[in-house]
């Protein structure tokens, strides 16, 4: 779709499943299961909705999904359902291949956001999947990924960024920065301290990617926060700041993990926030 002078597309990596209890934290199962029905292993269906932006000569991909480097054991654990590769999705939806992407941005380096940064060659070595792209990651996130805590260590897989460092394609950015005119990455703490969200502003319109602050439409209520969040109180505060603004200014919002409706608009009704479909 056109967004001001830019073209914007949602590029799905694949479907997968994570434990519903972990995804909804302290929210009781009898509540979250009404909006995100679990399977027989208590896992809920999710997607990875990467954002493609064509801005002049720049072809930008924000997040790269879970990737295709997984052993069969983990494919089963996460119920990874890949109907086509990220490169095939790019070609089908955006009309370009991976080699034509010029900038890759990771909101953070968790494996479900950075897994497609690299791919395996015939010898099983991880190499950059976007051979002609610069990769942007916040310096704080990179430093945390290099020395994670015991609580989130399993979310960081070095093969998703070390090959980028070795190839010279990785560029470390500060907390808030402009990618191209109108597109900024801004840090919002909660999920961790260094996750960044994209904000695209064109002709008075705003597109905002919530990354893992509001991973699905079901997470819009302030208190519906993931158990994965390192700083859940800060997630709530960020949502209290951003959601009213999104409703007031009629933002187009991207929900990275929503399996059915990646884009929506926030609206307030009777003191609660909801999501309307973007036509």
Language model segments and positions:
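Hydrophobic/aromatic beta-strand patches that form the interior of the parallel beta-sheet core
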Residues: 9-11, 105, 136, 171-173, ...
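Conserved beta-strand hairpin/beta-sheet module of binuclear metal-dependent hydrolase folds
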Residues: 2-92, 197-213
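Cap/insert and terminal regions of metallo-dependent hydrolase folds
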Residues: 76-88, 201-279
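Active-site metal-binding loops of divalent metal-dependent hydrolases
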Residues: 13-14, 64-67, 109, 140-141, ...
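Metal-dependent catalytic neighborhoods of phosphoester/phosphodiester hydrolases
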Residues: 114-125, 265-266
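Metallo-beta-lactamase
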Residues: 81-96, 100-112, 122, 127-187, ...
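Residue-level marker for the onset of beta-strands and adjacent loop->beta junctions
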Residues: 47-49, 175, 194-196, 262-263
């Amino acid at each position: 779709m056109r967004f001001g002078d830019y073209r914007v597309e949602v590029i799905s990596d694949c479907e997968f499943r994570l434990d519903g209890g972990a995804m909804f934290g302290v929210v009781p199962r009898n509540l979250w299961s009404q909006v995100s029905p679990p399977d027989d292993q208590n896992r809920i269906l999710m997607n990875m909705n990467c954002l493609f932006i064509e801005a002049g000569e720049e072809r930008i991909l924000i997040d790269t999904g879970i990737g295709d480097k997984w052993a069969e054991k983990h494919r089963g654990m996460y119920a990874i359902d890949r109907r086509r590769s990220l490169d095939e999705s790019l070609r089908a939806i955006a009309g370009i291949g991976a080699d034509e992407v010029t900038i890759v941005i990771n909101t953070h380096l968790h494996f479900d956001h950075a897994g497609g940064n690299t791919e395996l060659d015939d010898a099983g070595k991880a190499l950059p999947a976007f051979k002609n792209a610069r990769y942007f990651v916040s310096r704080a996130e990179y430093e945390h990924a290099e020395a994670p805590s015991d609580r989130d260590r399993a979310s960081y897989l070095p093969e998703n960024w070390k090959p980028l460092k070795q190839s010279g394609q990785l560029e470390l950015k500060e907390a808030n920065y402009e990618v191209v005119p109108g597109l900024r990455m801004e840090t919002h703490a909660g999920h961790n301290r260094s996750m960044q969200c994209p904000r695209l502003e064109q002709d008075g319109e705003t597109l905002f990617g919530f990354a893992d602050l509001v991973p699905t439409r079901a997470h819009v209520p302030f208190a519906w926060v993931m158990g994965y969040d390192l700083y859940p109180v800060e997630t709530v505060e960020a949502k209290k700041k951003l959601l009213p603004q999104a409703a007031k200014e009629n933002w187009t919002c991207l929900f990275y993990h929503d399996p059915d409706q990646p884009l929506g608009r926030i609206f307030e009704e009777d003191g609660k926030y909801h999501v309307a479909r973007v036509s």
